[in-house]
Amino acid sequence: MSVLRFFFVILRGNFIGMTITELQQQYAAHPNMAVMKRLLKDTSVQTVFCGGLCASAASLFSSVLVQEGGCPFVFILGDLEEAGYFYHDLTQILGTEKVLFFPSSFRRSIKYGQKDAANEILRTEVLSRLQKGEEGLCIVTYPDALAEKVVSRKELSDKTLKLNVGEKVDTTFITDVLHSYGFEYVDYVYEPGQYAVRGSIIDVFSFASEYPYRIDFFGDEVESIRTFEVESQLSREKKSGVSIVPDLAVTGDVTTSFLDFIPKDTTLAMRDFLWLREQIGRAHV
């Protein structure tokens, strides 16, 4: 695992009126960018010290590395606010498909003990997508989020129900598994951890998805899978397969550090390692 400390490219020139793509191309063409890419590919290099970028320039520089590197990146910012700004900048450049936010599961501070369901979904989505081995993921987080333990990879695998279009599976088996995972049977799903059955259709709201899934069967065969809007019930996107995950904080054995969960080839980027370690220690639960 390599560690990148923010950041080291300085550009000079008139950048007024440039689009985000044009600015990104300026950073990509900088000679120091080639040096950075070479250092990150060198497995003998464990730490790279960088300097020279301020504000959104760090996001532009980071986006070039993320786009051209297949291994995951984890950017650790100082706090929720700073991480939020950095995440917003990256999504403006790279889109939202590969850029993920890993927040604390608590609404305010860990010490108040108030969980936030939306944050728990984001955390579970990150773990689920890392477990799948997706390439090019970029994760933005901060010390309070890293202080919380997560489930192990084995635990996540054991508690994940995978379904694919064309697969033959007994609907009773699915509902039994959902029940064993702690999902609540309801007439209509409206929040994570719920499922509903209407004829040949099973609606289920996974803790690893922003939207619930509608799984349509033809006999015992999965005919289609779609995400849908809770309020309008209208379909959003077709899926070839899905992973359904329960509330891991309740059903799982939460004993693993997030930094132990991520792949070994992950690049970590942070401003101050010693300060970060101290902050995680203070917030540790």
What are these regions (language model features)?
Residues 7-282:
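ASCE RecA-like P-loop NTPase motor cores
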